[in-house]
């Protein structure tokens, strides 16, 4: 249940049961180096490969959300892809280090994402065409009946997607340093004395839910006396 709205959080087996094994296998056998930003550090690439080991299992699980289907009082629904495998970048502007960072979402740089996103749209179509909703007479206005083939649907997704639902994470990931991590389990930055990071950037991958409550939970663990926060303050 979402505030003032309804939402469904569904795993890939519920969305595309006939294709889930093929999708997971395709990801497992990819050459990830071909789909990461140019100049990606070997440690960061190693981290992506470690995440892939987890993702190939996640994609097959019914209880891990791949689709967040937002249902509200408006005459539309927006399928949100919870676990994209494409990776973007956040960099300092070399011409002005004090300016806003340069952000590249890297959306659909891994072709598997466009395939999964198309599956999400097909699922939403089936949902609104289901017998349960027939009494309400839903009418599809977008993408519309003329968008029928896989190629047409993928092209429509590319033209209409929004690259973010404002859940950015991972720029200071809690991972081992040799996997591209920035902070350890105590949230202290590697190689810097007394500096810790406590925000959404430490989450290595987007959780299958809005990030707000996850960040609250991290902050609570840090702020309570005798917990992680005290250890951070006393570390020399």
Label for each model-derived stretch:
Residues 76-132, 157-236:
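C-terminal structured subdomain/cap of oxidoreductase catalytic cores
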Residues 135-150, 227-236:
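Active-site-proximal substrate-binding core of FAD-dependent oxidoreductases
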Residues 1-74, 131, 145, 152, ...:
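Mid-to-C-terminal "cap/lid" subdomains and adjacent gly/pro-rich loops that border
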Residues 8-14, 102-109, 136-147:
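Charged, low-complexity surface segments at secondary-structure and domain boundaries
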């Amino acid at each position: 249940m979402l505030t003032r709205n309804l939402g469904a959080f569904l795993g890939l087996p519920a969305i595309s049961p006939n294709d889930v094994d093929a999708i997971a296998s395709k990801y497992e056998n990819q050459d990830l180096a071909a789909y990461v930003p140019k100049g990606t550090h070997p440690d960061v690439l190693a981290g992506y490969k470690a995440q892939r080991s987890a993702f190939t299992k996640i994609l097959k699980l019914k209880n891990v959300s791949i689709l967040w289907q937002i249902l509200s009082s408006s005459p539309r629904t927006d399928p949100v892809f919870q676990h994209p495998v494409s990776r973007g970048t956040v960099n300092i502007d070399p011409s002005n280090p004090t300016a806003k960072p340069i952000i590249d979402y890297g959306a659909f740089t891994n072709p598997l994402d466009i395939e999964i996103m198309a599956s999400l749209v097909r699922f939403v179509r089936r949902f609104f065409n289901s017998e349960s909703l027939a009494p309400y007479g839903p009418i599809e206005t977008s993408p519309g009946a003329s968008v029928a083939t896989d190629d047409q649907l993928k092209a429509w997704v590319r033209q209409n997607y929004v690259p973010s639902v404002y859940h950015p994470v991972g720029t200071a990931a809690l991972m081992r340093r040799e996997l591209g991590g920035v902070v350890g389990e105590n949230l202290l930055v590697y190689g810097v004395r007394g500096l810790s990071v406590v925000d959404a950037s430490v989450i290595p991958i987007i959780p299958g839910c809005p990030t707000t409550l996850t960040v609250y939970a991290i902050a609570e663990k840090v702020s309570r006396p005798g917990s992680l926060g005290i250890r951070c303050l006393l570390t020399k």
